[in-house]
Curated annotation (Swiss-Prot):
One of its GO terms (biological process) is D-glucarate catabolic process. It catalyses: 5-dehydro-4-deoxy-D-glucarate + H(+) = 2,5-dioxopentanoate + CO2 + H2O. Its EC number is 4.2.1.41. Belongs to the DapA family. Keywords: Lyase. GO terms for molecular function: 4-hydroxy-tetrahydrodipicolinate synthase activity; 5-dehydro-4-deoxyglucarate dehydratase activity. This is Probable 5-dehydro-4-deoxyglucarate dehydratase.
Length: 302
């Protein structure tokens, strides 16, 4: 898939990022992961992010990322697979190349590890990754790697395969500046934790797709909510926010790192155990798992 085709695909519908399955020894459980990606592919995601943030990219070593990508590609059918990459520039380039070789249709460039840097340094980082591959790249603005509108415009000029911008910062005024300046030169993706609760504000800012974590365990509900957003069905949007997302977020916010842990827990509730999260994350307690099961059951009954 060439970069322009990927750009069109990403903008065509709802996105998600599968969790990465581990066995009890915390090794990649490829068989379970394949079954999960195959199941998700039946719910019309526009693209899936393999080894993304919810896929515990930060806990995978560089050799595991192409394994995850290859496993996803084997069962995803026509659904594009976008691989995570990141860390320092040399490691990000290494992962990018190996993911492309493994069959990834594109890359999501996560922030470099720990380091805060000036715009020139961030530009050099993104440019190095883009120029190392031929597939499309989406840059993820968040935490310690926040590119401004001028920097993104410059990168778009210098890197033809930079096709997307994903925002995980939440400064809607900055997002509006970027979407207004760049227009259709990029596809714009919402990337806040449980982005559904932010989606209406982002839609108004010109960001009409996002990556849904809960798609992992309630894909039909996630698509119903997204469809209501796209069609302006405010009653359905409000119903799902109040009945599912607000109590879900309250549970997610109980502990640090639960934005990932609670997604794996959701699959566990369904009887599709993805295995534990890797340290330093922690799994939900039995009491929290029961609370999540009640939230899911209530949403299904609505």
């Amino acid at each position: 898939m060439n970069p322009l085709e990927l750009k069109k695909a990403v903008g065509s519908g709802l996105l998600s990022f599968p969790v990465t399955h581990f066995d009890n020894d915390l090794k990649f459980d490829e068989a379970k992961y394949r079954r999960h990606v195959e199941w998700l592919s039946g719910y019309d995601a526009a693209a899936l992010f393999a080894a993304g943030g919810t896929g515990e990219f930060f806990s995978l070593n560089p050799a595991e990322v192409p394994q995850v990508v290859q496993a996803a590609k084997a069962v995803a059918g026509n659904t594009p697979i976008i691989s995570g990459t990141g860390y320092g520039t040399s490691i990000a380039v290494e992962i990018a190349k190996s993911a492309e070789k493994a069959g990834a249709d594109g890359l999501l460039l996560l922030p470099p590890y720990l380091m805060f840097a000036e715009q020139e340094g961030l530009i050099a980082h993104v440019k190095a990754v883009c120029q190392s591959v031929g597939i499309g790249v989406i840059v993820y603005n968040r935490d310690n790697a926040i590119l401004n509108a001028d920097s993104i415009a410059r990168l778009t000029d210098e890197c033809p395969n930079l096709i997307g911008f994903k925002d995980g910062v939440g400064d809607v005024d900055k997002v509006i500046e970027i979407t207004t300046k760049l227009q259709d030169r990029l596809v714009y993706v919402g990337g806040m934790p449980t982005h559904e609760v932010y989606a209406q504000a982002y839609f108004a800012a010109g960001v009409t797709t996002y990556s849904s974590a809960v798609f992992n365990f309630v894909p039909a509900l996630a698509q119903r909510f997204y469809g209501a957003l796209r069609t302006g069905d405010q009653a359905t949007v409000d119903e799902i926010l109040k009945g599912f997302f607000f109590p879900f977020v309250a549970l997610r916010n109980r502990k640090k790192g639960y934005a990932v842990s609670i997604i794996k827990a959701g699959l566990r509730v369904l009887g599709q155990d993805p295995g534990p999260v890797r340290p330093p994350l922690t799994d939900l307690t039995p009491e929290e798992l029961a609370a999540l099961a009640q939230i899911i059951e209530t949403a299904k009954a609505a």
